Every structure is written in structure tokens, then in C-alpha cells.
Amino acid sequence: MSLDNQTTREGDAGFTGMASRINPLQLKEGMVQLAVNMRLDRGVAQTRKGAKRLADAIAAGETELVLDFTLGTDIAVTSITRVGSTATVTTSSPHGEVVGQIANLRGATQAEYNGDFAVGTIISTTSFTITVSGTPTTPATGTIVLNGGPVVRSTYSGGVFAAGLYSSPRLDDSNEYIVLAGPDAAYLWRDGASLVTKSYPTSPVSEQILPGDDVSLIQAFDRLYLLRWRDEPEYRLSSITQTTGTATATTPTAHGYAAGQVVRIFGSDQAGYGADFLIASAPTTTTFTFAVPSGTVTPSTGVAFARRVCPPLVWDGGSGNFARVGLGTHPAGETFSRMPSASIVTYTNNQLLLARNRDEVLISDVLDAETYDPLLKSFRANAGSNDQIVALHPYAEGQVLVFCRKSIWLATAVMKPDGISIDPAASSLQLLTNEIGCCARRSIATAGVYVFFLSDSGIYRLDNQFDLKLRGNTKPLSDPIADLLSEINVTAVGLSNGIFFNNRYYLAVPTKLANGLPSDNPNTLFIYNMLNEAWESRDSHAFNLDQLVVSDYGTERRLYASSRNGKLYLLDQYDSGLDDQPSGSGTYTVAGQLVTRRYGFGSLTGKRMTRTIASVVLPAGATAAMDAITTDPDGDFEILSLTNNGISLEDYTVKGPIRRNANMLDLRWRTTSGRPILRAITAEATVDSLPKTGTRTEE
């Protein structure tokens, strides 16, 4: 009988998924510990394709610039008079301005006098001229102040704050466009078509998107709506009175409002005072006026509040630009509502549903996205709790999923035959679970019967056959990669976004940067492969993936990513394995990595690791390498590298010597150029033919 050491082999004939949290020694054949920038199609592992930069004509620009500064001192303005487009500003004390310097004026009743202006001429130490637009009343009225700066702008070189899709017979024969919302205009892009730019309103005040705004783009019928929500302080109103249709609201402290801005009044017992109103004037620092029906009861009763809001903007697909939706009391009556300011919205069953506040959902009239009935077509979810609505999402059979931060509800809102109100007998609001909720509304994606979403506890998946059992099945879909998700920046998790495409769920999340600091924007892409029923890869890019969109590219449906820096990228495009640089020129190599499961060769004892054999395919110019990672003793070293210097794709069976003693072995496959393919891998080790024995001498 031979006493030679036995050679044993262990390996993987293909690769199906990634499980980084599980003990790598327990992984089944085909599973890997880590896959970075890889695709696991048909059992082979290949580096992903490169991303192509698009839409360079978009002028949204880079992200905002943040500087330390100290504001100048406010100076009272005694008068502003106008002749033509030239206005003369007179101050109560020396202004200190020079020609060309930017002066900020605010507090004028006439909106045209408010804003940043370049000083035209210096008349005296207390007066200078500026150029204004329009024909505002002269002299100006209101409590006006001047601040010499430095200038604090809303945006510095802009950015892209949201992305969506739009198609209509009114635009390019119903071809689909990707819409990118910039700070002062929206851009519509389609492959092969000219860029379409649609500006936001500039009167009575300029409508802009500011950093920190929560922005949504949604199409309802043939109209495109841009909705914004901005954190603004609330004021408890001391009183509201009205005379001949002009309401005057009084605040206990200075409100800072100006004519032309929009304010939401809520809490009054009189429905006529409950809406988003256009501020007509601000006579003093503690009062402002707005229009209401002349028959509204005065004074207001109840506890009323006011807060500034950003009115929804709408574009009808024609040659014009965006406009504000209607404001104030609805023409149909005080109990109806126009479209309120909101950012949580969905479109289903020819109706627009939006969250007006933390627990209330309004439903629009059928085929009319700008008419709402808060009394007869609304519902509340988890009212009275410390929960809040995060997202609304269409579900099966006309139902709507209401995702709160700590719970999930299923709303069935059945309209009466007249289509005007909800039928209470046939409608319901059902709690699916109060154990998990959603922490990022853009992470929700539908895939057939499934709905994917990101929660504080991980990534989950619902379906219409399983939803009622969700309460007893709280294990997240992301459990195999929970350690990787632990790197998410929780302060920015709400910016995460997901989409389903090509049998995969893509989720972009903010994780650590290369320097170890947390990213404030989604920079890492996790991919779940539905065909393999496993996590496939963790992708990294040099640009942020602020919103994922699926649209046409030529004759195919493709996956895009819009970035906060004002760029649009087509993902998985270049076979070269090169990503376009965000800067506008040059490329960088997509570095792929795969770490196999841990090979123990059937025992926990020491072995002689001899070699590895791999079946690989290298395109022309591609380069790859293999590392061995040993356990007990620990080691990490390269065992082979390979470059295809030819002009065509080549198949290889490569062998890498290890020649180390260890208990266990991991193999790391690295790609450094091109898109190499790893088809199968085997490791060999020699094991003692006889078990280890010891001797003991007794006396």
C-alpha cells in the first residue's frame, strides 16, 4: 500500500452569486465571497462594461461651492424710484457700494425690486442706481433693506437634482426623453435628438431648486410636473382677517416673506384660509396679504400656521416653459384644493396621489392632476404616531403601497361611480407590517410580482402572494451582504435609489469614499441578479449615481445614471472596460475583483497548497492576475499574471504555483485592463495519507 501523500482538489465550475457575510468556508459551490465590478452571466465571471458620458450640452454644471463668509450689515432703504429701467436707491446711511458691486435688496412690495443687482452708477454716498426688469410701481413700497454682501447665491454652477421620463404627442411624435432637473431649468435629452431646455418661471419671483430640496419629476397625462419640498420654519399666526377678498395674516415675529412668494396656511377652522397662497404684499415685517373668497368668515378661528412652500411647476409639452400651477382657493369651492406643494407623489389609475403632510394622502380627480378634495378623496396612514410617509408606490389591482419609515400599508381606494369621492364601504387601509419600513423612496422598484425597497434593516422584497405573511418573515434579501451594507452613510441614506432592469435590481447607495470618509451621495451600486437569485456585484464608479433611469438608446432599452455634477451616463456600454472620466476627457480602467469561497479540502488540518488551475478568456490587450490568500498561517501573495498581447480573443488554461503550507485557501481574481473572463477554477493540495500521530512515554 502506497504511503504517498494524497492530492485533493476543490474548486468551482462556475459562479452564480456573492455572499460576503457568511463564513466563506460554508459557501456552496459557485458562490463567492466578493465580486466587484463583475457580471455573473451563464456561470462565468466577467468584468463589467464601461460607462459612457452623455449630454455634455447640459449646462447644469458642477455641484455647489461652499465657502465661509460673514454677511454685511443691513442698511435701511428710504426710497427706490424708477425712470424706465433705471432705479435710484437711497439709503439712510452711507452704503459703501462701488460700480459693478452686487447689492442685495429685499422687503419691497414690488418683487422686481428684490434680489441681487449690479450697481450702475454712484450718485452719492447714500444713493446709487441699478437696472430693473418690468415696470414696477414707483416709488417702491414696503420695508426695504440693502445688504452689500458678500453675495450668497442660491447655486454655484448648478447641478442635476432629479431625473425622470417624459413622452407626449406634443413633443417629437411621442418619443421618450430623459428629463434632468437643473437649478433654474429642466433639460430633455434623447439619443440622436437636440437637447430641449425648459426654464422655470422668473416672475413674480425666480423659481429655483436649491441644494437640500427634495425634488420629484412625474408625468401625469401629457403634462410634466416638477415638485419640490424645502425645509422652512413654521409660524403660528396671531390672526387672519379679510376685507373684500384680501386676507391679512399677522405673525408674532418677523416672517421674512416677500411679495410673489408662496405660503401655506393650515389649521384654520375656515376652509377658505386653508391652501397654498401667493403673497400679494408684505406691508410690515410681521404681516402679509393674500387673496381669498370675499365671503370667507373673518376673523379666522382655530390655531392657524403659515410656512413658505415651493409651488409645483408644470410644463404642457408645448413650446412654452414651466409655469406655476394654480394657487389659492380652488374655483370649484373652498372645500376643494389645488395641487399643494409636495415631493412624495405617484401616478396610477389616471390619478395623481401625493402626501400633503407626514401622514395624509390626497387623491386627484380622474384626468385632472390639479384638483383635489381633501374631505372626500384623502386618507391618513399611521396617524398620531411618530411615523411618517416616505413613499407612495403603485401595486397590484389598482392598489397603492404606502411606505412609512417604520411601517408599510396597503391602500385600496375605490371610487364611487361618479368618480368624485371614495367609496368607504369598498375601500380599505391595511397594515402589512410595523416591523420594517422604507428609508429611501427612490429605492422602491417593481419587478413583475415583486417590489424591492431599502429599509433601515436592509433590502427587502414584497410580492402580491406573500405580502400578508411579511410580518412573520423579516429576514432581509440583503442578509448575504449585510456587512457591505453596513458601510452606508445613514445620514444620506434617503438619497439611495433603485431600479429594475435586465433581470436585475440595481441599488445605488452612499458608502465610504476612497479616503475612508462617508459619501454624501450614492456612489456604490449593488446588483441583485433575479435569474441567479443571488447578489451579483458591488460596482464602483468615479461619478455619483444620483438617480437611475431606464430609457431608449438607439433601438434598445438601456440603463442610465444621472449625476449631481450635471452629467448623464449610459451604464454598461463600452466593451473595452473603460469608464469615461466625469471631467469631460479621458477614461479610466474598470478594475474587477472576485474572491472565491474558502477551500478547506475536507478538513481543518494543515495541507500543502500546491497550485491552482483556471480556465480563462482574455480579449486582446486584456490583463488579469491571481492571488492566493492562505489561512493558518496567513498569507496573501500573487501566484500568476497574464496578458493577451495578441489581436484577438484567446482561451487559456493557466496554472499558478502556490507551494505553501496552510489549513485553508482563498483565491482572488483581479482584472487590470479589458474585460477578462473567469470560467472555472480549481485548487490542489496534498494531504498526509496517514493521520498525525504522537507518542508518549510513561514511567
Where are these regions (language model features)?
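Beta-sheet repeat architectures centered on beta-propellers
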Residues: M1-T70, P150-Y200, P204, Q208-Y225, ...
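Small/polar beta-strand repeat architecture
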Residues: G17, L71-S154, P204-E207, D231-P311, ...
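Generic recognition of long tandem-repeat/solenoid scaffolds
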Residues: S85-T91, I130, I178, L226, ...
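Hydrophobic/aromatic beta-strand segments within beta-rich folds
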Residues: V89, G100-A103, F128, A249, ...
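Predominantly extracellular/luminal cell-surface or secreted proteins
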Residues: N104-A108, T131-S133, W189-D191, R264-S268, ...
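Short, surface-exposed terminal/edge motifs of secreted or surface/virion proteins that either
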Residues: T126-S133, A185-S199, E232-P233, T286-S294, ...
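Recurrent small/Gly-Pro-centered beta-turn motifs in extracellular repeat architectures
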Residues: V132, G182-P183, R228, V292, ...
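Beta-propeller and closely related beta-pinwheel folds
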Residues: T155-F161, K198-L210, G326-L495, A534, ...
